[in-house]
Amino acid sequence: MSFRFGQHLIKPSVVFLKTELSFALVNRKPVVPGHVLVCPLRPVERFRDMSPEEVADLFQAAQRVGTVVEKHFQGTSLTFSMQDGPEAGQTVKHVHVHILPRKAGDFHRNDSIYDALEKHDREDKDSPALWRSEEEMAAEAAALRVYFQ
């Protein structure tokens, strides 16, 4: 069964957590090692359109996933980010939370991560040549999936 993520169909091999209302997947073009996404299962474009149950499930999943990726990728902190609407930088019309494990000195200016996320998400900069291989993404998802079994 594939997962819908906006205009994209996501293969189960890159999904490492599925809850009642959410799923988590590895990123095809991570900003930092361990940069992953958590999304509601229902394809909902804006945060305001989610039900209270979906919001609770999404953020409980994000908390669990954050704990795992911080540990697995030897981070010391986390950045959680959501762009909600086109003016906020949302390019995939499906609510999603970016979770990025952080380390001291990973960016010269700490807030530069937001510039990197903005560039990362721009469709005009999104070439398949920049994506990781399906095999690499599946291997990362398999390693993360172990934490949730």
UniProtKB/Swiss-Prot annotation:
Keyword Oxidoreductase: no
Active site: H96
Keyword annotations from UniProtKB, A to Z: Apoptosis, Cytoplasm, Hydrolase, Magnesium, Manganese, Mitochondrion, Nucleotide-binding, Nucleus, Phosphoprotein, Transcription, Transcription regulation, Transferase
Alphabetized CDD domains for the sequence: FHIT
Record's keyword annotation contains Metal-binding: no
Site note Important for induction of apoptosis, residues: Y114
Cellular component GO terms held in the UniProt record: cytoplasm; cytosol; mitochondrion; nucleus; plasma membrane
Listed name of the protein: Bis(5'-adenosyl)-triphosphatase
Cellular compartment(s): Cytoplasm; Nucleus; Mitochondrion
Binding-site residues for substrate, renumbered to this chain: H8, N27, Q83, G89, Q90, T91, V92, H98
Molecular-function GO terms, alphabetical: adenosine 5'-monophosphoramidase activity; adenylylsulfatase activity; adenylylsulfate-ammonia adenylyltransferase activity; bis(5'-adenosyl)-triphosphatase activity; nucleotide binding; ubiquitin protein ligase binding
Post-translational modification: Phosphorylation at Tyr-114 by SRC is required for induction of apoptosis.
Assembly with partners or alone: Homodimer. Interacts with UBE2I. Interacts with MDM2. Interacts with CTNNB1. Identified in a complex with CTNNB1 and LEF1.
Motif (Histidine triad motif): 94-98
Domain HIT: 2-109
Lineage summary: Eukaryota, Metazoa, Chordata, Craniata, Vertebrata
